[in-house]
């Protein structure tokens, strides 16, 4: 190193240090002889015992060399690098490992035990011997890879050496001695991870099987996280333990921070870049952390003059120095201009110094605006000195810490400083000098290269420097001014240059603009610098980039992030964009950041760029203002070969991830059917030209995984080949003529008619279903299937899962003892295909699944367990249900139900699975047993209640009919009696599931039995009542109207209201000539006058019922009969023909409003169906009794022709008619 400095000084003649003699030896200061002794300082000698140059040098050298071999280096680079490592860590002479250990011991003033020291050093020596042997065997094999013997030796040594490291690492992490051993641990961990990388680089060539390579790779990933978190945790522990109260403790604290950043954290930041699957080509990494060399102040005062050391000269407190010197987290910037202000400290004309008392520093981020900071006193009478740093790397500073004595008061300041610079864009270099003048004072030289030496001594320091000056702060006291230089690693370039032939990592603190809500925060210790934190919903930051290609080239983009919730991210570079892409959460809310918290947001859609561009990152789904952390952005150049290799590695990783590590013939927990389809798409899109054999092998594995998925799925027809397909073997209950829905539901899907099955699209590889909305919540869109009891295992948890492309108001139920229910709203997108990519349609119209596409929320799992609310916006969903004991006779099973009951609702879903998850243990087992017992107790109570209600309902139904043939009504049976019996039938609870009333419940069979007889009764009653719509439930349908009349709702009944005497309502009715009929009318008269209901034939034979407001109700006989051969022709057509016949004889207002409504409208049963106000197609109307004031009158009528007319009118006031019946008498 000395030769390099000499070389530099010979080239730069103007850089010689001023010849400032030590006048103190010649001075005669009789007033205070001690002043002379206090000024005796050997210039140029820094004897601070805390600094160990060899320790720092080794750490810097190793980190610098590693930066050059990241990703997949050339074989020659690896051989050379390992030779370098062995020479650095196991050289001839004193053991560097012992120096690492002693250096940290001195900093923290804690020594490890002798046993720990001896054991660690002995084990390290053994590792060194083995590593040297491995390195030599690797070189031999790289020279002749076909040599079987060399390959065999290398294979054996590799396995043994990796195992040695695995066993040795705990010896460098002894409890209560973690901090002093930390630098040893970090260097050993680095070697272990580099060794594990060799399995991916060379393993297949020197004999490792694919399973062994995968195992070593997984160990590398695991150990990377373990070693990173360990080093960061114990670094922070050691640093916090050194936190003190005074300036001297701060000096030691800062030295620990600096030296262990160089020897530990810089290595840790590079660990993830050893992953050859993530970095399959040469990779450029950057360290943006900032470190601080020691303050430029006297530290080597002679014995007895300790007060002249800067930290004893009334220096500020620990916390004051930390606040003044250490910059808060910030964007990376570069100094452009330094203006130094000076004051004079004079004892005499022969003892004085003009020294640095304050400064103003102008800095700029990459492509950002200029910022200015001032420190110390800038209001002085001496002309300031201005130094220009624009586009210059200051790689070395040389500064004098001056000491002057005024009477008994020491003055600490810097009278002279030199800044050696180099322009990294060209060969220019030089130096800048600060000095105003000084003489007769003591000086101590501080050379930054003592604390931050170059990466190598083999080249001049202006080429091999490791750090550049980034900022200057100032420690200020009454008679103290001590500048502190901060430095960044030279790997953090000034231009954010993106390479066209290697992966480029750009830390996001190299941005030039952060939008509101975004800030820089301290890194967790393993990121190589500070990171970005944001809670914005929109644009996050902007940064300048320089692509070294002049023509457009495509790059893949990925962002390293940590998030406690799902995130939709977009990166824009110039006019090219990745489009929005969804990424899952990586950590829990309020969890501390660890290496496990970070993962890559990798965009499948690349960008095209060249030259100078501006890049931006934005988030589009953070309405809740959640916090996200970003570390860096990476650009991977895309070439045909790289793309094929990248796709192959991605597909291999995806296929391997389908199966468990212990059993490659068993699916891993959490692998879904949709996931398998997605992996099959990856494999199918592999290049036949580059990897045909691998593609075939992977395709066989994926097919096997799909078969395993099909075998475990308990759903019938999960691929939606049909809906509502009747099996050939469904049984029928002969007594009730009731098809066993339980049986048919166990053999496929059943649903409403508006559901459609669609072939696969760009989201689904297989069939999927579309569930539209509905206009009436009582008639929802539904899809269901039953998992039969025989398919289930006792005391087991099962999981329903699937993929939802998009949905709104989609309700999902799993029903056994009770219902597990979730409502999911999953937003979709108009297209998953970016506008900039090729057409997503194949030659035959099929989706081109190999075209680049983006997803809005991929792989976001929504697992709903034990009543938890399922997060919205999750395309993957899962819902669990627990099964207790199995009862094949009861056949309770599990109902799987999808339902939409809103007009706006909709859903597109597929890849549905119902699979066994795990046996129930502990609390879950106890919980399902309690639920089962509660359900059985409820069932027993229901059975007792059902027996009573059924008996009452059956008696009422039987009373409607003449006998048990149920084909003739009793003569006195009227519509009110039928509805009263129907109401009793509907008191039978749990005839159908409240969640979906087309699914039968435990009492469905007896309900359908009685309900069928009610329907028969209504049919028979309709057959003998020849008046159509006589209860006006269908408005004025089948009636002819003259004048103004209306059908209104009164007491929950439909009534005809005739408010004017000139109005008239009539109906022509066909009858059986010579037979007897009873005309029965229930009505109410308001006001004066009479209400009249007249029956007549076309010329004569007229009779009439009259209603008045002040008369008593009369009782009429109710004998009725049937006209079976005629009523078979009654219906809508007959109604229309009767009206037509009537129009031939009478004038009819054919424009009268007709508001049709179903004859038996569904209504709410608040007394028996509290959990569901909709009864689907059950034929029951809540028929209330006739209100007080209404009268029922009857007359007998014997028509002589086949047609009669019934007319309704009044003389004045208002006439309200509840019903009109014309009943055929029995013969």
Curated annotation (Swiss-Prot):
Keyword Chaperone (UniProt) = no
Q: Name one Pfam family in it.
A: Endotoxin_M
Entry keyword Transmembrane: no
Q: Where are the membrane-spanning stretches?
A: none
Biological processes per GO annotation: sporulation resulting in formation of a cellular spore; symbiont-mediated killing of host cell
| A single GO molecular function term of this UniProt record | signaling receptor binding
Q: Which InterPro entries match?
A: Cry1Ac-like_dom-VII, Cry_V, Galactose-bd-like_sf, Pest_crys, Pest_crys_Cry1Aa_dom-IV, Pest_crys_dom-III, Pest_crys_dom_I, Pest_crys_N_sf
Additional free-text comment from the UniProt record: Toxic segment of the protein is located in the N-terminus.
Function, as annotated, reads: Promotes colloidosmotic lysis by binding to the midgut epithelial cells of many lepidopteran larvae.
Concerning its family, UniProt says: Belongs to the delta endotoxin family.
Q: Return the protein name.
A: Pesticidal crystal protein Cry1Be
Identify the taxonomic lineage of the organism of origin.
Bacteria, Bacillati, Bacillota, Bacilli, Bacillales
